[in-house]
């Protein structure tokens, strides 16, 4: 069922970006609640009645009402919003206006400025046939469509001819391609242009030599007394023929398709230009006798005449001549019609003039075939005057023949001229189209233009949809896939990747822009399978012991050695942000700012998250002036046994400006007493000395650090009654133990708190954290080493800001005052024993962070929660836990009764 949009976000957003797929009953209810439906096409909203869409039930909009499941709806529309009863189609909004009017009026018209092909595609998408177009628009639509289809067909043929030049399947493809471009594409290079000019010069020279050979002054008589070619001109012709032969052979050898080369009209002309020369040489050299030569001479003359075809070789280098040839080939219908008209006129008028002039003396119209010449010359309006009619009837027939000739020739000639003009323009357009296509291909190869066809768009949309449904048999991985069952593409900006310990901090800004997820009861009720409350304490202890044992063995002195790189089979990187409170700023200790951020190991529990904090590059909120963060942890207490070593929490050093000078106080806390209660029997096993429990069911109680600190760990293992984790609303910082050489058990703090601890677990009044800045107790001061400081900005942190940098850039600030303990059901780890007075200062609850290893890639739920919403949750009133890291409060002034400023960073 669709979830409610969290506060601070746009509630009018579409369904698919914020919620799970709705149930069919919700879809049916949304359609039946209103007689109208909103259709959003390309951002333009339309409102129409359902019954209007029912007029064409077989169309896309007609099928919309019958789609009652999420999958069927997405097959019809691109997105939908049931709350607004709105369906979105990412199509052309202008064309949809005509289509929607067709539903309303039953008449389909095409807009004047609309492209015919584009409108046809829109009709196909909406499921409307083009035959419904009105007569006023149908002729224009089909004319434009046929014209565009013809142009596209010609362009496709040209591109197909270009793509057919494949040299991969032949030997020396690169060299052959260069040679082919050199001979066939004069514009490909300067050398190709020079070669084309040389070829043109040889054609002109051969034509001139052929013409000069016919001059009697330059001819020579052979041994038989017959005129023959001049020897010098014969040598010139031989050189030209040699050039033509070499050019033809090189074209043939470099051509990608030999059969296509032979069929080419230009190549046929080249062959006819050189073939007569070799045939003439063969015939003259093989027949030396006079009789044989006389018989062969006529054949040789025919081939000598064919030499004139060399002039047609210029068509290879002239676009105009090529256009003329293609025009004649494409205008064969008009040319045939012209010849038919002329033949009919010639036959009619030659017969008439013959019968009109046959009785005259010395007439030249002796027969009808003899009159064909006169009729042809007359109809073409040439009029040589060698033959003409003399009688009156003959002259009348001649006049009618002239008029008929003008009409017959004038009709088909303009069609041929138009074809030539159109073909010439098309040639220019195709040249530009080829250049544009080549530029687009280069841009696609370079990655500057992405193909946006339907298949690519569908593939990208399918990549975004990743619904993980775990089977019953895959119980081992069910904890990692519970929160994957959603279709929100905006949630998949967070990808799980394993990075080295030396990875750059800048990668966080691009790789992990996690979008905040919504608050839903389903997510809160999934704690039985995905919540870290069901982690076994024994497993966490064993895991942490392995980590700490590896670190202590490899680094006896962690302060002096670097932690070696150890491969992590499973790492997660989580971006954490500092929560900046818009309240008063306090002076801070002058400490060094840590600017290095590392990755977070998923196998580390929150107890081993020793971290540097820096938000100067990552947080969208400007940090307060001179606000620095530094973490330092207490070292081992000398003289303590293994069971007395625990991880003390990092403490705050505050400096608050009360007057002219800032006052700073640093406290050293030394835990000296530990009481461990195991309520779960022997199932958890004994608590290891140097292990920290990651179980959210444990609770460590802090006492007054100035006197003694009593810590209690309670393990209550009950899977059926696991407490649900209320939403925490601060973004975690990227931390990992793999990146810090100081992540030993002495440098880590785990405090797991319960709101209502079991009876008997309350601490003494002295166990509360003191607000007075005193030195350590006298009994402990000689044995407690100097603690490392963890100074924060000294300001009150009674509010937190949830930052969502992934999608909405909305900032939600929740101010929550902390009421008295008796009325506050919020988690608190410090409790007084029954009947004893409480410390007048407020205690700051600290809670455990869920272990990253138990969560999947989108497990971090940034849940928006209004003020007091936790109190209203009846299912969690009795037993609530909150997972976050915190720094306990330390009041710098004994007289201050205000709340201790804390800095919370929740995971």
UniProtKB/Swiss-Prot annotation:
Q: Which GO terms describe its biological process?
A: action potential; potassium ion transmembrane transport; potassium ion transport; protein homooligomerization; protein localization to plasma membrane
Reaction equations catalysed? K(+)(in) = K(+)(out)
- Reading the lineage from the top rank, the first entry is Eukaryota
Which segments show compositional bias classed as Basic and acidic residues?
A: 508-522, 813-823, 833-845
Gene Ontology MF terms in the entry:
delayed rectifier potassium channel activity; potassium channel regulator activity; protein heterodimerization activity; transmembrane transporter binding
Reported tissue expression:
Expressed in pyramidal neurons of the cerebral cortex (at protein level). In the brain, the greatest density occurs in the olfactory bulb, followed by the cerebral cortex, hippocampus, and cerebellum. In peripheral tissues it is most prominent in whole tongue epithelium and circumvallate papillae.
Gene3D superfamilies linked: 1.10.287.70, Potassium Channel Kv1.1, Chain A, Voltage-gated potassium channels. Chain C
Q: Which residues lie on this side of the membrane: Extracellular?
A: 213-232, 285-296, 356-368, 389-395
* Ranges of compositional bias, category Polar residues: 523-534, 690-723
| Activation and inhibition | Inhibited by quinine at micromolar levels. Modestly sensitive to millimolar levels of tetraethylammonium (TEA). Modestly sensitive to millimolar levels of 4-aminopyridine (4-AP).
Query: Disordered: where is this region?
Result: 1-22, 503-534, 550-570, 680-860, 884-907
Job of this protein: Voltage-gated potassium channel that mediates transmembrane potassium transport in excitable membranes, primarily in the brain and smooth muscle cells. Channels open or close in response to the voltage difference across the membrane, letting potassium ions pass in accordance with their electrochemical gradient. Homotetrameric channels mediate a delayed-rectifier voltage-dependent outward potassium current that display rapid activation and slow inactivation in response to membrane depolarization.
Q: How does it assemble?
A: Homotetramer or heterotetramer with KCNB1. Heterotetramer with KCNS1 and KCNS2. Interacts (via phosphorylated FFAT motif) with VAPA and VAPB.
As for family, the record states:
Belongs to the potassium channel family. B (Shab) (TC 1.A.1.2) subfamily. Kv2.2/KCNB2 sub-subfamily.
Q: What is this protein called?
A: Potassium voltage-gated channel subfamily B member 2
Task: List the source organism.
Answer: Rattus norvegicus (Rat)
- What taxonomic lineage is listed for the species of origin? Eukaryota, Metazoa, Chordata, Craniata, Vertebrata
Q: Which gene encodes it?
A: Kcnb2
């Amino acid at each position: 069922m669709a979830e409610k949009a969290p506060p601070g976000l746009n509630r009018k957003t579409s369904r698919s970006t914020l919620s799970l797929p709705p149930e069919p009953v919700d879809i049916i209810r949304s359609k039946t609640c209103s007689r109208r439906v909103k259709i959003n096409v390309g951002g333009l909203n339309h409102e129409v009645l359902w019954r209007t869409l029912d007029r064409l039930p077989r169309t896309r909009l007609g099928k919309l009402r019958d789609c009652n499941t999420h999958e069927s709806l997405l097959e019809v529309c691109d997105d939908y919003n049931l709350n607004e009863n709105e369906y979105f189609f990412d199509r052309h909004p202008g064309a949809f206006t005509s289509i929607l009017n067709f539903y309303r009026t039953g008449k389909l018209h095409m807009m004047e400025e609309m492209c015919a092909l584009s409108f046809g595609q829109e009709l196909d998408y909406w499921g409307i046939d083009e035959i419904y177009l009105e007569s006023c628009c149908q002729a224009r639509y089909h004319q434009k469509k046929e014209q565009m289809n013809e142009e596209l067909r010609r362009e496709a043929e040209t591109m197909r001819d270009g793509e057919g030049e494949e040299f991969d399947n032949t030997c020396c493809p690169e060299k052959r391609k260069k040679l082919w471009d050199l001979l066939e594409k004069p514009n490909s290079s300067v050398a190709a242009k020079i070669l084309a000019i040389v070829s043109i010069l040889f054609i002109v020279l051969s034509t001139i030599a052929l013409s000069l050979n016919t001059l009697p002054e330059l001819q020579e008589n052979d041994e038989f007394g017959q005129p023959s070619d001049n020897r010098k001109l014969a040598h010139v012709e031989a050189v030209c023929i040699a050039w033509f032969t070499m050019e033809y052979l090189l074209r043939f050898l470099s051509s990608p398709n030999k059969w296509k080369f032979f069929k080419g009209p230009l190549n046929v002309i080249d062959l006819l230009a050189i073939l007569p020369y070799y045939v003439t040489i063969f015939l003259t050299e093989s027949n030396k006798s006079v009789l044989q030569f006389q018989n062969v001479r006529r054949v040789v003359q025919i081939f000598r005449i064919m030499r004139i075809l060399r002039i047609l070789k210029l068509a290879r280098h002239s676009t105009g001549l090529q256009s003329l040839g293609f025009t004649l080939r494409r205008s064969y219908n008009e040319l045939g019609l012209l010849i038919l008209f002329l033949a009919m006129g010639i036959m009619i008028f030659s017969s008439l003039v013959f019968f009109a002039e046959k009785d005259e003396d010395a007439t030249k119209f002796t027969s009808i075939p003899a009159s064909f010449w006169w009729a042809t010359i007359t109809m073409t309006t040439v009029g040589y005057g060698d033959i003409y009619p003399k009688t009156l009837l003959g002259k009348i027939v001649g006049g009618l023949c002239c008029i008929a000739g003008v009409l017959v020739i004038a009709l088909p000639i303009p069609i041929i001229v138009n074809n030539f003009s159109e073909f010439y323009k098309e040639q220019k357009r195709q040249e530009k189209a080829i250049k544009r296509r080549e530029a687009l291909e280069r841009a696609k190869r370079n990655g500057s233009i992405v193909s946006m066809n339907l298949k690519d768009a569908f593939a990208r949309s399918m990549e975004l949809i990743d619904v993980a449904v775990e089977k019953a048999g895959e119980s081992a991985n069910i904890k990692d896939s519970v929160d994957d069952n959603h279709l929100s593409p905006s949630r998949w900006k967070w990808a799980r990747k394993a990075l080295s310990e030396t990875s750059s901090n800048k990668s966080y800004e691009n790789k992990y822009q996690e979008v905040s997820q919504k608050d839903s009861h389903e997510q809160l009720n999934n704690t039985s399978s995905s919540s870290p409350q069901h982690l076994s304490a024994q497993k966490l202890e064993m895991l942490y012991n392995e980590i700490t044992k590896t670190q202590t063995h490899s680094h006896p002195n962690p302060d002096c050695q670097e932690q070696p790189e150890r491969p992590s089979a499973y790492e997660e990187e989580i971006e954490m942000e500092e929560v900046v409170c818009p309240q008063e700023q306090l002076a801070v200790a002058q400490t060094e700012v840590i600017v290095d951020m590392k990755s977070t190991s998923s196998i580390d529990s929150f107890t081993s998250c020793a971290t540097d904090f820096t938000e100067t590059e990552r947080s969208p909120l400007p940090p307060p002036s001179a606000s620095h963060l530094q973490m330092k942890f207490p070292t081992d207490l000398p003289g303590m046994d293994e069971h007395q070593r625990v991880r003390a929490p990092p403490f705050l050093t505050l400096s608050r400006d009360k007057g002219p000078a800032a006052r700073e106080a640093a406290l050293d806390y030394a835990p000296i007493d530990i009481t461990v209660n195991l309520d779960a029997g022997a199932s958890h096993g004994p608590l290891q000395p140097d292990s920290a429990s990651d179980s959210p069911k444990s609770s460590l109680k802090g006492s007054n650090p100035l006197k003694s600190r009593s810590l209690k760990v309670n393990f209550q293992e009950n899977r059926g009654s696991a407490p649900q984790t209320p939403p925490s609303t601060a973004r975690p910082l990227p931390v990992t133990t793999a990146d810090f050489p100081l992540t030993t058990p002495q440098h880590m703090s785990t405090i797991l708190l319960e709101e209502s601890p079991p009876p008997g677990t309350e601490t003494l009044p002295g166990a509360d954290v003191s607000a007075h800045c005193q030195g350590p107790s006298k009994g402990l001061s000689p044995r407690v080493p100097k603690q490392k400081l963890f100074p924060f900005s000294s300001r009150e942190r009674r509010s937190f800001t949830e930052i969502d940098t992934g999608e909405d850039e909305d900032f939600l600030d929740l101010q929550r005052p902390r009421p008295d303990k008796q009325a506050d059901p919020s988690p608190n780890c410090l409790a007084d024993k029954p009947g004893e007075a409480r410390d007048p200062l407020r205690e700051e609850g600290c809670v455990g962070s869920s272990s990253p290893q138990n969560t999947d890639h989108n497990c971090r739920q940034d849940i928006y929660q209004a003020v007091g919403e936790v109190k209203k949750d009846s299912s969690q009133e009795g037993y609530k836990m909150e997972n976050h890291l915190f720094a306990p409060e330390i009041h710098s002034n004994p007289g201050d009764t205000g709340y201790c400023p804390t800095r919370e960073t929740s995971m």
